[in-house]
Amino acid sequence: MIPEIGLGTWKYRGGSKPLLRGIELGATFIDTAEMYRTEDQVGEAIRGIRDRIFLATKVSGGNLRHDDVLRAADNSLRLMGVDVIDLYQIHWPNQSVPIRETMRALEELVDRGTVKYIGVSNFSVQQLKEAQNAMSKYPVVSNQVLYNLKSRRIEHDLTPYCEENKITVIAYTPLADGSLAGKSRLLPDKRGAVMEEVAQESGKTPAQVALNWCLTRPPVVVIPKTNSVERTEDNCGATGWRLTADQLQRLDEAFPV
C-alpha cells in the first residue's frame, strides 16, 4: 500500500532535505527515472532508511530491448545504491520494440528479485491492454500519467479502465507546473476565484485543494515535485481530509474535462 502523496523528482535539485522532510510527513513513495538523472540524489537521501521507502524508477523508452532493460535496471540499482526497485516502470511506449520483448525482461527482473512490481507510464488504454496481454506471470500495477485540474483528458477512458482493472494511476504534474499552487500564478478568471473560495472554506492552500481533488478520483495517487522544504510540507498537507461534494462539484464546473 503506497501513500496517497509521493515525491516526484523530475528536474529535482533540492538535495536531501525536502525529500527527507516529505518522508517524515508520510510521503514515503519516491519516484525517479533514469532520464531524470536524479537517481543518485534519491539514493543519497534514502541511505540508511531504505526499508521505509517505496522506491520507483523508470527505464527510458529508448532502452526497451530485452538486454537494454536488464542493463538499465542494473545501472539504476547502482546509482541509487539499493538492491531492489519496488516499482519499475516503462517511461514511454516505443512502437519500434515489441511490447512482449520488454515485458519479458521486466518479468525476468521480478524473478531475479531485483524488482517487486511492474508499471508503465504515459500509456493509453490500448497500449496498457497490450502490455497486460504481453505479461505471462505478473500484473501491470500502475500507469503514471499527466493529471491535474487543468488536464483531465484521462477521465474519458483511462481512469475508468484503471479503476476497473485495479491499476493505480500515478498522477505527475498534479499542480500543473505550479500554476495551481497559489493565487498569484492562477489565471485571472473564474477558475482562480473558485480555487481561492474552496481553499478559504477548507482552511487549506490552493495547492492542497488541487492535490486533494486528484485524490478523490480513484485509483489516483499524486507525486508533486518541489525543491523546497516549505512546499513539501504544504503538499503533504493535502492528505488526511477530503473536499466536500459541493466543493468538488464547483471545482469540476470551473475546470471542465
Predicted regions and their residues:
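N-terminal binding-site loop/beta-alpha segment at the start of enzyme catalytic domains
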Residues: 1-53, 178, 256
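Glycine-centered flexible beta-alpha turn that most often forms the glycine-rich phosphate-binding loop
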Residues: 7, 30, 85, 118, ...
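Acidic-and-aromatic substrate-binding clefts and catalytic sites of carbohydrate-active enzymes
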Residues: 12-15, 31-41, 62-67, 94-98, ...
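Short, acidic/polar
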Residues: 12-23, 65-80, 101, 126-129, ...
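Acidic (Asp/Glu)-rich catalytic clusters
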Residues: 21-23, 43-52, 74-82, 108-110, ...
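A short, structured active-site edge motif that brings together acidic residues
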Residues: 52-64, 87-91, 144-147
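Active-site groove signature of glycoside hydrolases
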Residues: 80-97
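Beta/alpha (TIM)-barrel catalytic core signal, keyed to glycine-rich beta->alpha loops juxtaposed to Asp/Glu
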Residues: 93-257
